[in-house]
Amino acid sequence: MPVRQLPEQVVNRIAAGEVVERPASVVKELVENAIDAGASRIDVFTDGGGRRRIGITDDGSGMTAKDLALAVERHATSKLDDEDLLQIRTLGFRGEALPSIGSVARLSITTRHAGEPHAWALTVEGGEKSEIMPAALAHGTRVEVNDLFYATPARLKFLKTDRTEAEAIREVVRRLAMARPDVAFTLAGEERAPVTWAAALPGAAGRLTRLGDILGAEFRSHAIEVHAEREGIVVSGYAAAPALTKANALGQYLFVNGRPVRDKLILGAVRAAYSDYLPRDRHPVLALFVTLDPREVDANVHPAKTEVRFRNAGLVRALIVHGLKEALAREGRRTAANSGESALSSFRPAFTPRPASWDWRASPSAPVAPMPSFDGAAAPAFTERAQAAFDVGAPSADVRFETQPVSDLVDRPLGAARTQIHETYIVSQTRDGLIIVDQHAAHERIVYEGLKASLAANGVQRQILLIPEIVEMDEATVERLLERSDELASFGLAIESFGPGAVAVRETPSLLGKTNAGGLLRDLSEHMAEWDEALPLERRLMHVAATMACHGSVRAGRRLRPEEMNALLREMEETPNSGQCNHGRPTYVELKLSDVEKLFGRR
C-alpha cells in the first residue's frame, strides 16, 4: 500500500485519542483554557458523566471572530510563539484540544471579546465546522460539548459508569481549583447539589482556605505549612500531620507552576520525607506547589501534560524532602493536640443520673487502694542517668535522681507525671491541662532518634556481651543477616556465623540496654526479606534503626516509678519528632483543662 496523506478528520481523531481519553479529559482542557484566558469565575456543568453534555462558562477575555475561527484549527494557539516551547507559562500550549474535541463530539463555542459589539458562535460536529454567526453573551466564553464520542462509538465501550466518570470530572475540577484559589469555581449537574468554591484571598491563608474547602475540615485542622526555597526553586503548600493518613496515595496533590501533575520524582520525595513518621502501608495527605523558572522544567513530555521533567531533578527532590521534614519537625506537638480533640469528641457520660427518689445511701464496696504520693522526681538526662531504669526486661533499679517540685515541672511542655494507668500510659499535669503518654511509643521515638544521631556522629556506642548469645534460625535467614552484617555493625549490632543455622551475637547497641537479641534478629530478617534490592543504603539503615528502636523501648505493661516517668517526659521534650512514634501514631495526647471542664458541664 502506497504512503498517503491522511484526511484532516482522521488526523484530528488520532490526536483526540491522545488528548481526549474520557469526559474528564475534556473538562480539564476546557477549564485550563478558561484559566489561561484570565477568568476569575468558571462554571462547570455535566450530564451523564460528561457523555451527554459538558458545559464550561467563564468570564475570561473571550475571542474575536478571527480568533474563534483559528481556535478550532489544529496547532493554532495564542499561547506560544517560535521560542516559547522551552519556557511554557500557560496550562495549554499545543492548540490541539478544541479541534480534537470537535472531531469526536458536537462542539459549540460562544465567545465575546471586550472590544467586540456582540458575541460570536461556532459549531463543530464530527470535524465539520459551521459558519461563524453573531450571538448573545455578556462577556467571556461558553463551550458546550454534546454526545461525546458519537463520531467514534467504539470509544464509548471503554468508558466507565456515569457515576465513575462524574467522579473523575469532579477530581479534575478539584485539582484545578486547588491550583488557583483566586478563581471561583462552580461544579453542577449529575443530579447533585452544585458545589461552589468562592475565590480566596491571596497568600498562604487563602490557599489554606481553598484546600480546607476541598479536602475538608479534618485536613485543615491537621495542616502544616510547608515552605522551602533554594536557587530560584520554591516549594510551598500544606501537609497533614502524620496522624491523618490514607491507605493509598490519592490524597497527594502535586503542582508544578500551577499545573496539576503526577510526578514520580515528587512522589518519591514525599515518601522519603515521611519515612520516619508513617508505616509503609500508609500515605500522607498534602498539597505541594513547586514554582520555578519555566525554562527549568519541561511540560511537553506527556500527551495529557500530567508529567514534567526537571532540569535539576536532584535539587527539586532534596528541597521537597527538606521542606517537608522541617515542617513536620517544627509542628510535631500539634499531632498531640489534634489527637486530643478527636478523643474528646468520642467522650460520653458513663452513667445515667438516678431519679431523686432513689436511695443514695452508700453500699458496701471494696476499699480503693490509695494513689502513690510523690514530689515529682525528674531525671535531667534520660538517656544517661535514667537508662538503667529503662533496661528492657529489668526490674525497677535503685537509681538516684535529682528532684524538682511538681510546681516547677507543670510549667514544662509535657508537665509533671502524676500516675501510670494500665502500666501503659503516663498521665501528667500541665499548667492548663493534662497529657496522656503512650510510654512504649514515646520511648521508641527517643531510641530511634538516638540511633540516628549516633550514626550521623561518631557511630553507635556498643556493649560487648560477656557471653555471646547464640541465636538459631533457618539457613536462609542466617545468610540474609550475614549479608547485611556490615549495616548491622554500623548500629552496634555485631554478629558472626556460628555454624549452620546459627549466628553469634557479640555486641549490641548500648541504647537498647538489655534486649532480646533473638527476637530482634528475627524481626530484622523479616524486614530485610521485603527490601527491594534497589532500596538506597540510607533507607535500609533507617529501617534497621526503626526495628532496633521498637525492640529497645520500654514495653507496655511495664510499671514505672514517678522518677522514671518524669525522666521519659523530659527526654521527649528534647527529642525531635517526639509527637509521633516511628509508625505515625501519636505518642501523647493533650487535653486542655477547659475541655475537661466542658465534659463535666462546668463550662
UniProtKB/Swiss-Prot annotation:
Q: What is this protein called in UniProt?
A: DNA mismatch repair protein MutL
**Record family assignment:** Belongs to the DNA mismatch repair MutL/HexB family.
What is a single Pfam family found in this protein's UniProt entry? Answer: HATPase_c_3
NCBIfam families from the UniProt entry: mutl, PRK00095.2-4
Keyword list, A-Z: DNA damage, DNA repair
What species does this protein belong to?
A: Bradyrhizobium diazoefficiens (strain JCM 10833 / BCRC 13528 / IAM 13628 / NBRC 14792 / USDA 110)
Q: Which GO terms describe its cellular component?
A: mismatch repair complex
Entries under PROSITE patterns matching the protein: DNA_MISMATCH_REPAIR_1 (PS00058)
**PANTHER family xrefs:** DNA MISMATCH REPAIR PROTEIN MLH, PMS, MUTL (PTHR10073), DNA MISMATCH REPAIR PROTEIN MLH1 (PTHR10073:SF12)
Protein function:
This protein is involved in the repair of mismatches in DNA. It is required for dam-dependent methyl-directed DNA mismatch repair. May act as a 'molecular matchmaker', a protein that promotes the formation of a stable complex between two or more DNA-binding proteins in an ATP-dependent manner without itself being part of a final effector complex.
